[in-house]
Amino acid sequence: WESKYTININTQMNYWPAEANALPECVEPLERMVAELARTGADVARRMYGAPGWVVHHNTDLWRQAAPIDGAQWGLWPMGGAWLLQHLWDRWDYGREPGYLEKVWPLFRGAAEFFAATLVEDPASGAMVTAPSISPENPHPHGASLCAGPSMDAQILRDLFDRCIAIAGLLGVDADLSARLATLRERLPPHRIGRAGQLQEWQQDWDMEAPEMDHRHVSHLYALHPSSQINVRDTPELAAAARRSLEIRGDEATGWGIGWRLNLWARLRDAGRAYKVLGMLLGPERTYPNLFDAHPPFQIDGNFGGTAGITEMLLQSWGDTVFLLPALPPAWPQGRVSGLRVRGAGEVALEWDAGLLRQARLQARHGGRFRIEYREQPLELELQPGEVATVVPMGGRLFRLA
């Protein structure tokens, strides 16, 4: 809007397919933008909050403005920079390039230092929360959007603190900061399940009273995608609550909103629903004849969100595991794909027939340990740099071919 970058979902969605689809060079301009935002954001942190580090709100532009803009119901949200940093973590995790973490560590450290200085204790729960903030861009049922500690903020902070602790450990630096962040992480508000069985969007159980229950944003489901804090394998109860939230929200949305829902259904391993939502995204109401995504009007976020969603249906890489064909719909009974990347600097090719995996090939760029899973059957691989492993299913298990 107005030739600016909206960084409470839209800019991020544009980069969702980059790493997995072997386009890491496309992230370089975003990395430069984050470094520039850290400079303007440091001025905002100092002058607006009296805090160290740096902060960016929901929108920026060519001049890298970092303060809140437009209405409070959109702008007074301090998590934009922290979310963008997840793409820099992904750039390392998918590529594992030597020296990269040293380059970006000051950006992560500065963002963490800001929140370590500005989180406040919720007198009702004792949790450490952002305040004031909003749940982008959804109003709550009290005629306002401002609140303390919306679910999305805590979810982004969990990822930020975890990344900082991991990077500091790998680099052997800032042990005191890591210890402080670990303590703060334990005091963030937990995921909460509301009275309708949904994942709560706010600390309070307001979801069923919100004036826009079918809102285009699904901010509180960040933990399901693009994060993996909530997933069907490790947190099934929370995954069921996220599913309930999606059902309440509905599939109809803007083009990019449908793109986000596609990725969420893929993470829930609901192949049929993901395929249905993909059909909505590519239908005439949300895709123009030239395949441009329709917000409306044209908004490319939905194109890239859809690309990422198709990838997620075929291959997922989160936590410590590579998931093969996790949400393959019956409409795609056979096919193959190659050149997809996974965390740990691996490259994967897949072939399937009659809806079943035929084989997978994984090549390790730098070597290391990989965990592959197909239909809940895991296989551990230890590979040397450049080594290729071919994996096939037999008798309900995965085997590596000699």
What are these regions (language model features)?
Residues 58-71, 138-146:
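Aromatic- and acidic-residue-enriched carbohydrate-binding clefts of CAZyme catalytic domains
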Residues 2-4:
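Segments forming glycine/polar-rich beta-alpha architectures that bind adenosine-containing cofactors
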